[in-house]
C-alpha cells in the first residue's frame, strides 16, 4: 500500500505543478483500482485522474475502469463547480441582508489549486456571528436550503 500512496502523492505533485505523470509501466489493474480508491477517499480523484490519464502506464488500466473513472472525475468536477457557483450567488444575498459571513476552508482552500473545482469538498463552511444566525437561516431557507437536523433554537444549536 505504501507504493500506491507514494504514486498518489507523485501524481498529486504533478497536478499541483501543472504537469502530467510520465509513468511507463509497473502498475497492475489492481494497483490502478487501489490508487483511485485512495484518491477518492481523499477527495482528490479528479486531480489524480487529470495527472495520470495520458501517461503510458495508464494504457494498461482496464478500459471499464478508465471509463468509470473518467465519468466519476467529470461528474465530481461538474458538481463542485455547481456548488461553488451556488455559494458565490448566496454570499452576496447574505451581505445584502446585513450579515458578515466569512468563508473558511472549502472555496478558500480550493482557490489555491490550479483547477479549483478538481478539489472536491463535501460542504462549504461559513463562519457567522451568533447574533446573525436567524438572518442567515432566513436567507438560506429563502434560497431553497434546509438544515439537515432542524433545531428549535438556532442559538443553542450553534449552526444554521
Located regions from the model:
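Catalytic core of pol beta-like nucleotidyltransferases
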Residues: 130, 148-160
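Helical scaffold of the NTase/Pol beta-like nucleotidyltransferase catalytic core
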Residues: 2-9, 16-105
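Residue-level "edge-of-site" marker
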Residues: 52, 107, 152-154
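Conserved short internal alpha-helix adjacent to the catalytic or cofactor-binding core
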Residues: 11, 18, 158-160
Amino acid at each position: 500500500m505504501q507504493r500506491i500512496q507514494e504514486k498518489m502523492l507523485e501524481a498529486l505533485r504533478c497536478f499541483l505543478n501543472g504537469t502530467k505523470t510520465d509513468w511507463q509501466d509497473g502498475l497492475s489493474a489492481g494497483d490502478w483500482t487501489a490508487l483511485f480508491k485512495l484518491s477518492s477517499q481523499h477527495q482528490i480523484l479528479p486531480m489524480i485522474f487529470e495527472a495520470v490519464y495520458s501517461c503510458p502506464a495508464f494504457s494498461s488500466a482496464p478500459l471499464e475502469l478508465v471509463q468509470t473513472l473518467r465519468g466519476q472525475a467529470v461528474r465530481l468536477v461538474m458538481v463542485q463547480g455547481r456548488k461553488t457557483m451556488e455559494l458565490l450567488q448566496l454570499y452576496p444575498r447574505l451581505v445584502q441582508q446585513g450579515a458578515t459571513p466569512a468563508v473558511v476552508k472549502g472555496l478558500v482552500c480550493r482557490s489555491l489549486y490550479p483547477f479549483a473545482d478538481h478539489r472536491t469538498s463535501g460542504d462549504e463552511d461559513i463562519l457567522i456571528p451568533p447574533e446573525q444566525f436567524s438572518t442567515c437561516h432566513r436567507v438560506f431557507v429563502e434560497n431553497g436550503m434546509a438544515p439537515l437536523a432542524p433545531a428549535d433554537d438556532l442559538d443553542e444549536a450553534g449552526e444554521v
